[in-house]
Every structure is written in C-alpha cells, then in structure tokens.
C-alpha cells in the first residue's frame, strides 16, 4: 500500500559520492525478482560487502557504520541515480528503509521513479547539501526533519526550502500511486461504463 508522506524525521547517512548510478544502487544480477520486496538486502551490494554472497560487510562503507544503522534519509552528491532507468533502484532504497534522498541533482528518470514509489527526492543547492554533510558527520545520531506540507528541511537549527511539482506533492501527501489516482474517479468510470451501449460491452 502506498504510504502518505507529510513529515518525516530520521537519521541521515552521508554517502559522499557523485554520479552514483543505478547499477551501484542495485547491481544487475539482483534484478530477477518481479515484486518490490527483498531488494534492500542488495542495496549498494558492491560497496556494502567484501564478498559476492553478501555475507562479509565492508566496515569502511558508510551504510555499515554503527552510527548510521536505521538511517531513513540519504545524503548524496550531484547526479544521483544516473545510468540505466531501472525502477529497481528506488525499490531497493525503499525496501532498505530510505524515505528521503537529499542531493544537489538527480537523474531525471530516477527522480520520477522515486516519486512514483512514494520516496521523496529533494534538491538543495551544493552549499546547502555541504552544510548538511558537515552537520551529520560532526554529530553522531544527527537527525533531519522533512516537512512536505511546508516544503522545508530542518537540521541543526537551520531551515532549507525545496521545490516540488504540486501534483507530485499532492500524490505523496495523500499516499496516491497511479492506481489510487484512478480510483479517485471510480464513480465517474462506473457511470461511463453504465452508459456504454450493450453491443459495445
């Protein structure tokens, strides 16, 4: 079921890398599944693990640091989600527990896929993202609050405003995916179908 997104506060994990592509987010060998569940265990597989089986965590990768366990907000650098257009990338992030990604820029297809899957990608300036990186790196357990209704990010007694398409915002606030949007017009659809001549049914 789609999740309503109004306000979220969570631990932020700083992934200090630019041009993170979808193959790094979820490698191609894990794309056989046809449901959205179970991809989180393979998120950033090549970086998170030292072995192909995913049994030896890489202690030097930021998502494996004890201080960032349970993180639900991902900080990244520019052009996050570039590469192929696989929708499995936001599936993997969502299944891992990420609700928000904050970066200076995103690949267009990844940005749209994230919103379609009720995950919020937020664009802030390079300077604002750098401030958040410094805050999170310097403060263990640091949290960030995202308020979609006011379109603001709050951290370290500072507030950052972000833009989002009004229609996308409406869908997130109300937990609407494509099916949910269609069901909003269920009565009109039923009325239309009832007026279709019998020979066309």
Curated annotation (Swiss-Prot):
Keyword Zinc-finger attached: no
Xref: InterPro entries: 3-IsopropMal_deHydase_ssu (IPR004431), Aconitase/3IPM_dehydase_swvl (IPR015928), AconitaseA/IPMdHydase_ssu_swvl (IPR000573), IPMI_Swivel (IPR033940), LeuD (IPR050075)
Pathway recorded for this protein: Amino-acid biosynthesis; L-leucine biosynthesis; L-leucine from 3-methyl-2-oxobutanoate: step 2/4
Domain of life: Bacteria
Keywords, sorted A to Z: Amino-acid biosynthesis, Branched-chain amino acid biosynthesis, Leucine biosynthesis, Lyase
CDD domains with a match to the protein in the record: IPMI_Swivel
Gene Ontology terms: biological process: L-leucine biosynthetic process
Reaction catalysed by this enzyme: (2R,3S)-3-isopropylmalate = (2S)-2-isopropylmalate
Gene Ontology annotations for the cellular component aspect, listed alphabetically: 3-isopropylmalate dehydratase complex
Enzyme Commission numbers on file: 4.2.1.33
Oligomer and partners: Heterodimer of LeuC and LeuD.
HAMAP family tied to this protein: LeuD_type1
Function, as annotated: Catalyzes the isomerization between 2-isopropylmalate and 3-isopropylmalate, via the formation of 2-isopropylmaleate.
Family note: Belongs to the LeuD family. LeuD type 1 subfamily.
Name listed for the protein in its UniProt record: 3-isopropylmalate dehydratase small subunit
Species of provenance: Pasteurella multocida (strain Pm70)
